[in-house]
UniProtKB/Swiss-Prot annotation:
SMART domains with a match to the protein in the record: DSRM (SM00358), RIBOc (SM00535)
InterPro entries from the UniProt entry: dsRBD_dom, RNase_III, RNase_III_dom, RNase_III_sf
Organism per entry: Bacillus cereus (strain ATCC 14579 / DSM 31 / CCUG 7414 / JCM 2152 / NBRC 15305 / NCIMB 9373 / NCTC 2599 / NRRL B-3711)
Catalytic site positions: D65, E137
Name of the molecule in the record: Ribonuclease 3
Length: 245
């Protein structure tokens, strides 16, 4: 056997073993392992191995992007029943953006599994954020094709959803949503808002709102609308609660 073929065979054996260990790590065994390998195959690797029937991960990335948006959307819709469409959209965008996907990928050492061409390898492709984010989406696409939406949901429940529950994306929420998330996380009870006062002429009204937790006042706020007053009350409540932590 020519040395080049021997080297390539050894390389592929090494990667197949790595994928076996990876599946054991995440507790998922692919029915079609070719899909798993494809999810981690960069176009640069395919370009350098044209004589072999390799397929890159770009189509799986396309599919995974849609599956990820759907599953995260469903989770947020169920978790935050009072959150507005605009706030849900902002929160979802923060969860599926490139830096977040890179974080998820790095937690599972996705970079070490990627099949790269020599040029891409030499220029640091294995650690390139855009590449890692694409691989994470491609993996979701492969998992969906191989085992369906339920398994994708279970995987995200281990890797992604806990970050939401820990408040990793709270910075993109409005004050009311942040307060609601904090209270839910601690299991402290129910938050309620009450308009205490409306004052001023019709063209220049001012509202005063109070937010309570289990009938205990947490914050007061005022604004030109009920919504603004509630947001300010929530902001004051958040400040107080964070000082106590």
């Amino acid at each position: 056997m020519p040395y080049r073929k021997y080297r390539e065979k050894k390389y592929e054996t090494k990667y197949r073993e790595a994928f076996k260990v990876f599946q054991e790590k995440i507790g998922i065994t692919f029915t079609d392992e070719k899909l798993l390998i494809q999810a981690f195959t960069h176009s640069s690797y395919v370009n350098e191995h044209r004589k072999k029937p390799h397929e890159d991960n770009e189509r799986l990335e396309f599919l995974g992007d849609a599956v990820l948006e759907l599953t995260v959307s469903q989770y947020l819709f169920q978790k935050y029943p009072t959150m507005s469409e605009g706030e849900l959209t902002k929160l979802r965008a923060a969860i599926v953006c490139e830096p977040s996907l890179v974080r998820f990928a790095n937690e599972l050492s996705f970079g070490s599994l990627v099949l790269l061409g020599k040029g891409e390898e030499m220029t640091g492709g294995r650690e390139r954020p855009a590449l890692l984010a694409d691989v994470f989406e491609a993996f979701i696409g492969a998992l969906y094709l191989d085992q369906g939406l339920e398994t994708v949901w279970e995987f995200l429940k281990e890797i992604v959803y806990p970050k939401i529950n820990e408040g990793a994306f709270s910075h993109v929420m409005d004050y009311k949503s942040q307060l609601q998330e904090l209270i839910q996380r601690d299991g402290s009870g129910n938050v309620e808002y009450q308009i205490l006062q409306e004052k001023g002429p019709a063209h220049n009204r001012e509202f005063v709102s109070r937010v309570t937790l289990n009938n205990v006042a947490l914050g007061l706020g005022s604004g030109k609308s009920k919504k603004e007053a509630e947001q300010q009350a929530a902001a004051e409540a958040l400040k107080k609660l964070k000082e106590q932590l």
